[in-house]
Amino acid sequence: MSRRQPFRYVLLLIALLTPGLISGCATPSRISAVPSEFTAQAQPSIPNARFFPDRNDPQLIAEAVRSLEKERAWLKAGGHTGPLPPAVFLTISGGGGDGAFGAGLLSGWSETGKRPNFKLVTGISTGALIAPFAFLGPEYDPILYETYTQTTDRDIFKRRNLMAAIFNDALADTAPMAKLVDRYITRTLLDAIAIEYAKGRLLMVGTTNLDSREPVYWNMGAIASSKDPAALDLFRKVTLASAAIPGAFPPVMIDVTVDGVRHQEMHVDGGTTRQVFMYPPTLNLGRTSKALGATRQRSVYIIRNARLDPDWASVDRRTLTIVNRAVSSLIQTQGFGDLNRMYLTATRDGVDYNLAFIPRDFTVKKTSEFDVNYMRPLFERGRALAIAGYPWSKYPPGYDPADAAEVP
């Protein structure tokens, strides 16, 4: 979710001004939601397709173990007999058009010849659009360049008229973005992801289940590897859902079953519950690795597609301006919390922490969310920083290791 989306919270004003109209008119229909007592049992048609990080999900731990077993088997087949090689994780945050920064950084990193082959790649919102191509490597950088230097608002959404916005499920129609996703997310792409998944590499995308109000991590490698006819559609739906800003963009309805009974879950932008994620602290990677004899060097590279310094502005005394500014502040603060949680988890587990973000001196202004006159220079800035050797921050914003050392 970006900090600059001027129409994002118009829905709130509509709800305040027209309660009688809204309550008296039909809304889009849906299949019944999963009853609260069965949410943990609900499954899409593809096994092992997702995890619930806030529930200490044992399936997530089991997937980590399987990943290690597959990696060891692949290394052995290739003649590797020494210790496990370093594991490098990549996490890509939300940010709308600001995703051009991350796309440029990855492209520049490729040009240096030093970009790692990531063991784990995760993405939220715009990061979910980048993640599959980052996972597959530099060969797919041209897609990132095209997407984040040529895409405009009309390639992502169409604004609905006022009445449609009031009585439908969002202010805008994301049919254009669905076409973009269909263009790039193909069966061929899934086959390439499946090959890497078989080597023990993991690709995860985050959404938010709005019915149960919890984050969901989707195991995109397992989905890609599935022979289920619905695999391609589910992969596309998850990608679209991760970027579905609540109120602005329509939610994505995902079919699940409980004891053979069909239900639907409403999924929206993963940034509603996480701006960026690595793995849940409950996994305790350090302890698990020791138990499995899998001690190795690990590092995480976090791309936060946002500025981290205060974005000063003189706020007009207008309802929508105030709402937008306040909620943008909440999103920024949530992002800080995510970065701190990841730092604490990484420190506990012996994972080297590295953070990139849009620099303070990038001052180009945008006129819309996907403004190519903003995204192109942002892409080039990220690329140039990577080529020069990005100065990765070793700590989250506001953290002073000297102060931490003084705590008794």
Where is each model-derived feature located?
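C-terminal motif of bacterial Sec signal peptides marking the signal peptidase cleavage site
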Residues: L21-G24
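Patatin-like phospholipase
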Residues: A26-K119, F135-P408
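Hydrolases whose catalytic domains are alpha/beta-hydrolase-1, hotdog thioesterase
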Residues: I130-F133
